Structure formats: C-alpha cells, structure tokens
Amino acid sequence: MVKSHIGSWILVLFVAMWSDVGLCKKRPKPGGGWNTGGSRYPGQGSPGGNRYPPQGGGGWGQPHGGGWGQPHGGGWGQPHGGGWGQPHGGGGWGQGGTHSQWNKPSKPKTNMKHVAGAAAAGAVVGGLGGYMLGSAMSRPLIHFGNDYEDRYYRENMYRYPNQVYYRPVDQYNNQNTFVHDCVNITVKQHTVTTTTKGENFTETDIKMMERVVEQMCITQYQRESEAYYQRGASVILFSSPPVILLISFLIFLIVG
C-alpha cells in the first residue's frame, strides 16, 4: 500500500517535470508576448491599447522605427539616423549634419570695451606719475555762502570731475598732505583734458571745482585708510605665533 502511494507520487512528479521542460522548449508564437496577444513588450499591438503609443512601428521606445532609443531610425542614441551622438544624420561624432556642431560651445569673443573699462577703474595711471583713479562718486552738495554761487554750482556741477587721482595712503604722513596732492593733480588733469575739448573754465569754476574735489579727496582718503588698516590687521593676525601654531596643527591633522 505504501509502495503504491510512493509510486503514484513519483509518477505525478515525473509528469509535472516533463510538462515544464516541454513548455520551456516551446517557442513563442509571432505576435504573442507578455500580458498581450502581440509583441514581447507592452506598447506593440496590445489589444487594449498601448501604454506608450508608437509613432510609426518600431521596437519598444522606437517612435519612428529605429533601434532601441532611435526616434528616427538610426543607431543607438541616434535621433535622426546618423552616427552615435549625431542629432540630424551625417558626419562623425558630435557633428550635426545640416545643423551646427552639436554640444560644441562657440568661442567667446573678447569685448575690448569691457577690458578697457576694467583696466581704467582703479588702475595705475602711468601718464600721471603712478597716480590711481578712484571710483566714481556723487558730487557733493556744497553751499558757497551766497545765492549766486549756489545757483551757479547747481547749474554747472556736471562739468566738474566725479573721480579723483591719488597715490596710496602709505606714501603720506597724514590726511592733509594726501588731500592737498589729490586736489592739485585732479583739478589740473581735469582742466587740461576739458580745455583740449574746447571748453574753458572761469575763476568761479576753478574755485568751485577745488571745493568739490577737496570733499571727494577726503572721502577717498577715508576709504583707502580703512582698507589699508584692514589689510594690516589681517597680516598681523595671521602672522601671530598662536595662529601659526594652530594652522600648522590643522595641516598636520589633514595630511597625517
């Protein structure tokens, strides 16, 4: 009795294994496949509609009949039938055929106006014996003590300079010498430059110009002095023994 049961189970297992091998050896019929009665992948002839509707009959992900990832029938990654990476056919890698070269950035053109402007702002003026040109400032509102001069200044202030020439503050002993030199060179340079253009200055213009430039030179001195002391403080801080020791220890930890 036991032997008959064992024989029955062996027969059932044998039939099941044989059926499984037979199913594995069968080839899939054309048009049949996973979850559909059509192709192997979804989206190619599914009776219930495509999840990703095709655009011209190709493999999965082929909107126009090319290989995988070929929207217009080229090789892999060829959207319009050229070589790999050719968007519109023809040419070697990175060549766009009828279009410009693909993914090749154009060479930037140098703007000479920007170069000249960057060189002029804060640069050393060689023709003025090493003076530097400060940044542009708003012309100060100054009262000269009478209505005529106040009105004259408001009407002609655009003719006066809005930048000053100066040397580094460490070349002067105090603010007065800096301002005196700054006023002289700025007024002289502006007067000469403007006169060559056919415009003359009266004594009133020179008087007002000196007052305006003096205020701007004081402002320039304050800016330069603050920047100079900040640079000096940074140098002193990083040159102190505790800071040097700390930096050396950190470098040792990073390298080690």
From Swiss-Prot:
It is found in: Cell membrane; Golgi apparatus. Sequence repeats lie at residues 54-62, 63-70, 71-78, 79-86, 87-95. GO terms for molecular function: copper ion binding. The gene is PRNP. Residues 55-97 have a biased composition (Gly residues). Cu(2+) 4 binds at H88, G90, G91. Disulfide bonds join C182-C217. Residues 54-95 are annotated as: 5 X 8 AA tandem repeats of P-H-G-G-G-W-G-Q. It is linked to PrP is found in high quaPntity in the brain of humans and animals infected with the degenerative neurological diseases kuru, Creutzfeldt-Jakob disease (CJD), Gerstmann-Straussler syndrome (GSS), scrapie, bovine spongiform encephalopathy (BSE), transmissible mink encephalopathy (TME), etc. Glycans are attached at N184, N200. Belongs to the prion family. This is Major prion protein.
